[in-house]
Structures are given as structure tokens and as C-alpha cells.
Amino acid sequence: MAAASGVRRIKLGSQGLEVSAQGLGCMGLSIFDGTTKVETDLIALIHHAINSGITLLDTSDIYGPETNELLLGQALKDGMREKVELATKFGLLLKDQKLGYRGDPAYVRAACEASLRRLGVSCIDLYYQHRIDTTVPIEVTIGELKKLVEEGKIKYIGLSEACASTIRRAHAVHPLTAVQLEWSLWSRDVEEDIIPTCRELGIGIVAYSPLGLGFFAAGPKFIESMDNGDYRKGLPRFQQENLDHNKILYEKVNAMAEKKSCTPAQLALAWVHHQGNDVCPIPGTSKIKNLNQNIGALSVKLSIEEMAELDAMGHPDSVKGERSATYIVTYKNSETPPLSSWTS
């Protein structure tokens, strides 16, 4: 396993935000795997991340819901807030066990103010629209976010799971700092259009699920040890008919990792890091051991030939099954109506 060393800093986007080259995705600290966690242990993990140089912390008001922001609010007391870049999200809601989406101005403002209270901060560094509300022109949503920037409640604006045309329309209203998307060895469709668009416009790229929701960390057998409440059990790629095919990719990555004296998780994460200095992956974990391992991925060096080998491993035919549940909005269905259609 590659050892953890210093975490370098990168410029995320072209609007002035500087972050650690790797962030911490905090979703799993509060939700979605069905296990019970101890708050003091989670706060200790967050502090360990910050003290190790991982300063971009990523949360959302839907995680918990709300409890993840409250957890970070506790963790960032006593001077810790000044050491981090704090990112949260709005726009994805859970009501009566059903997902909903809102991007209207009144909701944007109310969601921001509620997040500020839960986090115990006066300003959010990076505020994303978590999923696009396809009933509201993106210009309207970004227009309200622009007001929040002007009022000092948020510093930078981002989108998550947005298509290239929506990104362009949003960026024309107020410059975007980052777009968050799923990017890993087994989720590469964003390379066709979204990544080039972000780079053309000077928008930073934040890669979530860079380890394939744990697939590259533990291999295909980890599905057997998942708690019954773990949402990943229901995802298409983890169904047995697809897993039998997908495990071949893991085996290839594992074999290459052994040659490089690192773990498959570190190799998969290093592949994301090597995509460019405009990319910040945000792997999540609730274990300090895994956090240290993820930081160690920054020390894994890949040659042009090794990157080409990994690219070949992760070709589209190497993976079977959709990456997310069919009921969740992704960039593939994130177009919004024209601004001319909006009546407030």
C-alpha cells in the first residue's frame, strides 16, 4: 500500500477557490449504508482529515436528511471552520419517502439559510444545486444564487449532475466554480461532452464516487457483507447478473495494483488524480484507516503507458448496469425550460 504523504493544493475553477487536491465526501457519515455510527468517532475522522491536509469537505442538506450538516457544524467548532473549504448542496428533497427537486428562487434562499444555521457558519464556500429542477429555467436558479453571492452568504456556485448545455446557460448568468459529477474507472460517460465543456469554460471538476461506490476498495464480494439498509444493494451494477461481468474489471485493476505495490482503491483513485490539476475527487469513508489509504493515492505515480492501460481496462464494455437508480435525475435528463417560459 502506498503511504500517505502531504496533500497538495489546487485551484478549483477560475474564480479564485483553492482546495486540497482530494476532498472528503461526507455522505456516508450520516446515511445510506444502514449501519449505526458514533458521532464522536465521526468528528474525530473529520478532524483527522483536516489535520492531514484534506480541507474540502462535501455535504448536502439531503444527507440524513440534514443530520450530515449538523455533524459538520459540530466538527467545525473551536477554530476548525477557518481551516476548511466547506461545500454543501440544495435542491434534492425527500418527502413521504419520495425524492423531489426544487430550484425556484424562494426555495433556493430558504435552503441556503437553513444550511447556514445547521452548519453554524455565516458563509458557505461552495454551494451546489444537487440535482437540476427541470421545471425551472436554470437562469432563474442561478440568478438567485448570484444574489446570495452578492449578499455574502455563499462564495462560489456549483452544479451537480448537469449536462453541458445546462452548464453553459448557468455559467452565462454567473461564473460557475465547479461541476460535481460521477467519474471513475467504471463511470466515464462524462468524458464525452461535460468534461470538455467544463475545461473550455474554466470550471473545476469534482469527482464523486471515484472508487465506484466502494467497488474498487473492496471488490465485488463486498456486496455480500453489506447491511440490508445499504442503498447500494439495489443499484443495477451490484446485481448478480451484472456483478459477474463487472468483477473482471476489478480483477484487472487489482493485478496492476499488486505490480505497483498499492491497493486497487489507490490505483483507481490515482487514475482520477491523473486526469488533471482541475480535478478534485471526493472519496468518502467512515474509517481513518481507509482515509489514510485514500490520501496515499496521491503518491501513486502513473506513466502515460500505465494510464493508457487503465483507460483500456475501463472501456464502456467493461461495465454492465446503469450507475444509478432509474428514479434519480442525472445529467442525462437535466435540461430546463427556456428563460422566456418563466413566470414568477
Curated annotation (Swiss-Prot):
InterPro entries according to UniProt: Aldo-Keto_reductase, NADP_OxRdtase_dom, NADP_OxRdtase_dom_sf
Active site: 63
Protein source organism: Arabidopsis thaliana (Mouse-ear cress)
A GO MF term: oxidoreductase activity
Family, as annotated: Belongs to the aldo/keto reductase family.
Lineage: Eukaryota, Viridiplantae, Streptophyta, Embryophyta, Tracheophyta
Pfam families the record matches: Aldo_ket_red
Keyword field contains Oxidoreductase: yes
Protein name: Probable aldo-keto reductase 1
